[in-house]
């Protein structure tokens, strides 16, 4: 990459462990509610949930908000070595504000702990969709690309490109509502709790 600048943001909540859980969303589609606003809203809500409810977390949490595709490429150009070493689960948040089926796009291997954690949550729902990495189309492409290969799966309600309002003026505030966003937040809350609260001390005393 050439020297230059790009507007973006990241936030880190340091935990007891350097091992990280990463959440990513994007800002680059003007005026679209589900395809654009819902992901960053959920990202912010997850950050607030952690700050308000955990005095100390076991894992470190990283939140990334960049323009889609080129933003994640730029971010990875700077941090990929550190992320490869420390991230053990990652989630891309996209199109999470409508009331359609809960959906996920698997990582390239389809067998990471992120895949298993997200799949465990959405299969509890009456209607859900699980897409292969072959159906990728958001920042999971970059984070899971060969040479990077982070353990990332994407969480959606309607998958991008598969709802009729996608990339039209109909993707507006009539399509999303607070209840749908809260329902999506609950999925992520449950994942966080399974990771951060599902840790138990073990004794090392012999005999």
Locations of regions flagged by a protein language model:
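Active-site-adjacent substrate-binding region
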Residues: 104-207
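Short beta-strand element of the conserved SAM-dependent methyltransferase core
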Residues: 9-13, 155
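Acidic/histidine-rich catalytic neighborhood of metal-dependent amide-processing enzymes
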Residues: 5-10, 21-22, 27-115, 125-144
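Proline/glycine-enriched tight loop/beta-turn segments at coil->beta junctions
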Residues: 15-20
């Amino acid at each position: 990459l050439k020297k230059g600048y790009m507007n973006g943001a990241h936030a880190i909540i340091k935990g007891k462990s350097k091992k990280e859980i990463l959440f990513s969303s994007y800002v680059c589609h003007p005026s679209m509610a589900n395809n654009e606003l819902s992901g960053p809203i959920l990202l912010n809500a997850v950050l607030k949930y952690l700050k308000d409810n955990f005095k100390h977390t076991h894992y470190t949490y990283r939140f990334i908000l960049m323009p889609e595709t080129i933003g994640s490429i730029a971010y990875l150009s700077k941090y990929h070595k550190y992320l490869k070493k420390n991230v053990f689960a990652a989630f891309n948040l996209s199109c999470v504000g409508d009331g359609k089926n809960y959906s996920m796009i698997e990582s390239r291997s389809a067998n990471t702990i992120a895949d298993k954690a997200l799949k465990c949550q959405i299969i509890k729902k009456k209607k859900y969709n699980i897409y292969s990495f072959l159906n990728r189309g958001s920042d999971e492409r970059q984070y899971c690309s060969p040479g990077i290969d982070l353990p990332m799966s994407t969480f959606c309600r309607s998958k991008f490109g598969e709802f009729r309002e996608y990339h039209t003026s109909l993707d507006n505030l009539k399509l999303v509502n607070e209840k749908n966003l809260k329902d999506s937040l609950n999925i992520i809350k449950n994942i966080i709790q399974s990771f951060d609260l599902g840790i138990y001390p073990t004794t090392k005393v012999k005999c």
